Curated annotation (Swiss-Prot):
PROSITE patterns tied to this protein: 4HBCOA_THIOESTERASE (PS01328)
Domain of life per record: Bacteria
PANTHER family xref list: 4-HYDROXYBENZOYL-COA THIOESTERASE FAMILY MEMBER, ACYL-COA THIOESTER HYDROLASE YBGC
Species for this entry: Escherichia coli (strain K12)
Gene Ontology biological process: lipid metabolic process
Claim: Ligase is one of the keywords in the record: no
Bilayer topology: Peripheral membrane protein
A GO MF term: fatty acyl-CoA hydrolase activity
NCBIfam families associated with the record: PRK10800.1, thio_ybgC, YbgC/FadM family acyl-CoA thioesterase
SUPFAM superfamilies, per the entry: Thioesterase/thiol ester dehydrase-isomerase
Enzyme Commission number: 3.1.2.-
Main location, first listed in the record: membrane
UniProt-recorded name of the protein: Acyl-CoA thioester hydrolase YbgC
Length: 134
């Protein structure tokens, strides 16, 4: 399996924070989603092209552990890798670190490949399997 770590930078904006002045927990989920999308794009799999092939990914399960907060204007790095691949699913392991490389939280995300018209599982495209099995 291609275990190359994909790194995606993000800055914390006011809209990402809560009344306590720290990043709202759900904002991390959005950061993770964007990083997975950017990882696929980096490997030449755009969401639009995948949809044209009747391929979409839906989150089946997500586990997040929070260790330390991020704050307004912090620069963060979202680290993403595919740690498991099966016939219809991928498991992403993702971490968010700050500029000091402190681990703020980490997630394991199980996504299932579906036909977006039927919303039923389908096999992962051979091109994705080939790209990430290298």
């Amino acid at each position: 399996m291609n275990t190359t770590l994909f790194r995606w930078p993000v800055r914390v904006y006011y809209e990402d924070t809560d009344a306590g002045g720290v990043v709202y927990h759900a904002s991390y989920v959005a950061f993770y989603e964007r990083a997975r999308t950017e990882m696929l794009r980096h490997h030449h799999f755009s969401q639009q092209a995948l949809m044209a092939e009747r391929v979409a990914f839906v989150v089946r399960k997500m586990t997040v552990e929070y260790y330390a907060p991020a704050r307004l204007d912090d620069m963060l790095e979202i680290q993403t890798e595919i740690t498991s691949m099966r016939g219809t699913s991928l498991v992403f392991t993702q971490r968010i670190v700050n500029a000091e490389n402190t681990l703020l939280n980490e997630a394991e995300v199980l996504v299932v490949c579906v036909d977006p018209l039927k919303m039923k599982p389908r096999a992962l495209p051979k091109s994705i399997v080939a790209e990430f099995k290298q």
